[in-house]
């Protein structure tokens, strides 16, 4: 109910404030007058601070009148809201220059296309998370956790994205192959065995092509990391 205004005033427990609790309410009012409103001089706040006095309700009523609150003692919820509004206005007035010169949060932070640039690579939670992902995806460990994360990102983009999964799940329609047009290079003496040998050779060629594709993808991924200007090339050597 009052959480936002209490937060604006740096109240110690904005979410848990219970205005129906008499002791908490009285302590809150003392804090509000001492720290924010400051309508009374310090020496005039004694009666308001004496929260255990039987005269405190009368003092509270006097306080509402002194600050020109339009609500009565019985209208506690409304009077609290009004007092908080007064405190916020006074707080802003005391610190107007500070608030006017304040810049929106993250206004000076450029939105980089590189999402990894603002990560704290020394954070233990970050390291533990990267290591867990690397183990899950069977990625080679590296002393540079940021480089490991980049490798994870490349793998996810290439293999686990929605497009990659859809592509892998789609049926591959093969073309009919005329086995007799593929020269085997030897003769087993059996036509059936010759056809089986041709099929095995074609399957082996297909596996080699897939392996070459994976090698090319790995080379591209490594080149992307090496081309990063933030990569520390002192970690490796070229030549002797």
UniProtKB/Swiss-Prot annotation:
Query: Gene that codes for this?
Result: rtraf
Instruction: Return the protein name.
Output: RNA transcription, translation and transport factor protein
Which family, according to the similarity comment?
Belongs to the RTRAF family.
Which Gene Ontology cellular-component terms appear in the entry? centrosome; cytoplasm; cytosol; mitotic spindle; nucleus; perinuclear region of cytoplasm; tRNA-splicing ligase complex
- GO MF annotations, alphabetized: RNA binding; RNA polymerase II complex binding
One of its GO biological process terms is: negative regulation of protein kinase activity
Q: Spell out the subunit comment.
A: Homodimer. Component of a tRNA-splicing ligase complex.
Looking at the record's lineage, which domain of life comes first? Answer: Eukaryota
Stated role: RNA-binding protein involved in modulation of mRNA transcription by Polymerase II. Component of the tRNA-splicing ligase complex.
Q: Keywords, A to Z?
A: Cytoplasm, Cytoskeleton, Nucleus, RNA-binding, Transcription, Transcription regulation
Location of this chain's protein in the cell: Nucleus; Cytoplasm, Cytosol; Cytoplasm, Perinuclear region; Cytoplasm, Cytoskeleton, Microtubule organizing center, Centrosome
